[in-house]
Design a protein with these regions (language model features):
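Intrinsic-disorder/low-complexity, polar/charged segments enriched in Ser/Thr/Lys/Arg/Asp/Glu/Gln
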Residues: 1-5, 60-62
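Short charge-dense sequence patches
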Residues: 1-2, 23-31, 74-75, 84
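Compact, glycine-rich, soluble single-domain proteins
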Residues: 7-44, 48-57
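C-terminal structural segments of small proteins and small subunits
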Residues: 52-85
């Protein structure tokens, strides 16, 4: 399993548009991709679960990938977070 921590920089946090884009990115991989905030872990492939975390600006999340293509998944997701969140 590979993971990274990220502090959300955008004012609106993870709202509908970037959440949808993030789910789309996560679905490209066979690995299970998750996000954790305040001890609650949700799959990145489930939009409503992701939105239920209520991630806001300044929150620190942990993104993890576990599976055969976890290295590629983490690289792609980290780049997505840095570019969009």
């Amino acid at each position: 399993m590979k993971s990274f921590e990220y502090t959300i920089k955008v004012e609106l946090g993870i709202h509908a548009r970037p959440a949808g884009m993030l789910v789309k990115e996560a679905k490209k991989f066979a690995s299970e991709c998750t996000i954790t905030k305040d001890g609650k872990t949700k799959k990145l492939t489930q939009l409503m679960m992701l939105m239920s975390l209520g991630v806001k600006q300044g929150d620190t999340v942990t993104v993890a990938a576990n599976g055969e293509d976890e290295d590629a998944a983490i690289e792609t997701l980290k780049a997505f977070f840095e570019a969009n969140l």
